[in-house]
């Protein structure tokens, strides 16, 4: 995420969003701030047209950049849709079963890093991390290259424990499902049993 915008653009976007700097990278929180600021700055609502244009430009550059980061990582697990055609978030995709699909067995899923046969979202994103890193042979330095729980913990400086899973769930929920490059039909379904 830090490579998408220049330092000045990042600071300008943080300022325009009225976002605390420590929340940079929390896409869901940033998206809420963006929507709120759009309502405040919209020229039809008496807002500042110049600031609105700057906000839209920076926000679009960030979203397009995050989308491109994922596209450049290599072969896709699923057919990609255009960024304007797929706006469903991960939580919208799985609606009522999102939290159960995210992590099937927290203790087991957190412990079994690269060898898990589980198909919950947490384990699938971890497997994806290992496949990408094996082929690219570089660490994840930018949030958005990888959305696994380990990179999330590293990015925000948190230990990988059971207590992290709810924060991770909240972080992943608003992210467009297409950015995660998951085959949604392979994700664990609690309704169908083990």
From Swiss-Prot:
Residues 12-75 form the J domain. A zinc finger (H1C3-type) spans 129-151. A zinc finger (C4-type) spans 109-123. It comes from the Viruses. One of its GO terms (cellular component) is host cell nucleus. GO terms for molecular function: zinc ion binding. SUPFAM superfamilies: Chaperone J-domain, T-antigen specific domain-like. Keywords: Acetylation, Activator, Early protein, Host cytoplasm, Host nucleus, Host-virus interaction, Metal-binding, Oncogene, Phosphoprotein, Transcription, Transcription regulation, Zinc, Zinc-finger. The modification N-acetylmethionine is found at residue 1. Pfam families: Papo_T_antigen. It is found in: Host cytoplasm; Host nucleus. Interacts with host PPP2R1A; the interaction inhibits PP2A activity. Promotes efficient viral genome replication by accelerating both G1 and S phase progression of the cell cycle. Inhibits host PP2A by binding to the A subunit, thereby displacing lower affinity regulatory B subunit. Inactivation of PP2A in turn results in the transactivation of cyclin A and cyclin D1 promoters. Late during the infection cycle, ST may induce dephosphorylation of host MTOR, leading to the inhibition of cap-dependent translation. May establish and maintain high levels of viral genomes during persistent infection in cell culture. The common region of ST and LT proteins comprises the J domain. This domain is essential for multiple viral activities, including virion assembly, viral DNA replication, transformation and transcriptional activation. This domain is also required for cyclin A-transactivating activity of ST. This is Small t antigen. It comes from Hamster polyomavirus (HaPyV).
